[in-house]
Amino acid sequence: KGDVVQELRKACDKYGLKFGVYLSPWDRNAECYGQGEAYNKFFIEQLTELLTNYGEVHEVWFDGANGEGPNGKKQEYDWDAILKTIRRLQPKAVTAIMGDDVRWVGNEGGLGRTTEWSATALMPNSYPGSDEVYKRLGINAMSKDLGSRELVSKASDLFWYPSEVDVSIRPGWFYHAEQDNQVRSLANLVNIYYRSVGCNSVLLLNIPPDKRGLMHENDVKRIKELTEYIKKTFADNKVEKGNRIWTAKVGDTKEYKVRKNTLVNTFLIQEDITKGQRVEGFTVEVFANGAWHHVGEGTTVGYKRLLPFSDSHAEKVRVTITGARGTVNISNIGLYYAEPLVDKTMKVTLSDVPVDGWKTVGMDAAAAIDGKQETVWKTETLTPLVVDMGKEVEIAGFSYAPAQEEDLTGTIYKYNFYVSRDGKDWMKCDATGEFSNIMHNPVPYFVRFGKTYPARYFKLEPVTEINNKAVTAVGEIGVLLK
């Protein structure tokens, strides 16, 4: 019914927005998925259509997901041909994630690294030989260190490959009506802004369209609040002559005057990245009440670094370069005041049935049913988790939350789910059997069966772990009634 892409193109033109397309390489519904050349031809034809029928395209975004198709095969992609197609048809377009212009930060929680190098040893994984480079250097997209001197000294090539932090405004990436009141708080989004844009990354904030094809009112309200907050906070730089280029070396210090009678609590520093990224360390002091006070320090700067600190009536600010790769080129220094926000942290409801009174059967796995995602039940085997809810309910689905920590070992990828009325006779529920993309998106997953099952007991049986290890980890599990 019409051309959705064309409608979006026209809307972008109307409101002065740049237009990009997201085409997932992981089209497991295609009959030819997993058939190598046949699927690559099919995919490039789709890409060609998108890049020739809708005017200028500013970005082409590919996710890194890649699982088995219905035929049990994984697709081998011809990335060289795919990227050449983009450069031929849309030479100015940025290619992201599986492209070679912007890389994935390594998580989908909205958190950038505190040390983030755009000049990195991480070869784009669409390049031939990237797997061998990762193995030799001991790195991947999720590694903490992607650009230290030690790592760079071992690398044969360096890449200008800036980081993108992607996160959803809701608990998941797609629209669900039951999450209408689980939109991230303004305080949470501002923190994400500081941890992404303020840590030398770009921010991709996902806002899923609802069943009307519109952004839900709650999402729109929050986005407007975020926009106004950022505009208000960074509209007026209190530092005098902060935008003059400062060429410095290690040990150099520069003082800036601050406008009189102003309250500040946020420091900004930027490098002239047309000359590269060179700062490895810096400190910040403010002069207030007749003395200098240390208010912050950081490692990398890059395009932008933001440091919040306690409210201060600063008269001057002093910046010292403590580490660098040659001469650094600072393009901007700023001080701002950010209004304090109270974080009413969004609460994700994982179970429609209260977990009070639940018991695990055959083992002590209380951490999996205590209502807290931050506590984790982990065992060094692929062990089924059996729960007695204490009473019979009509189960329509279940939720699984992986561990909310950096170490994702034990996260379940493929599973079976069973229910029982007596704890003896078990029925296997009709479910997809896998938490697709959970390795890259370790958020709570909600599985709905499409019908209900009467049950007092349920069992989650892990079949494979994300890295094929014999470990099981559950942050929390719940049941759904609708």
Say what each PLM segment does.
Residues 218-228, 233-347, 366-430, 441-482:
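Aromatic, loop-rich ligand-recognition surfaces of beta-strand-rich domains
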Residues 1-282, 286, 294-309, 320-332, ...:
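Mature catalytic domains of secreted/periplasmic carbohydrate-active enzymes
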Residues 249-251, 350-362:
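Short, solvent-exposed loop/edge segments of extracellular or virion-exposed proteins
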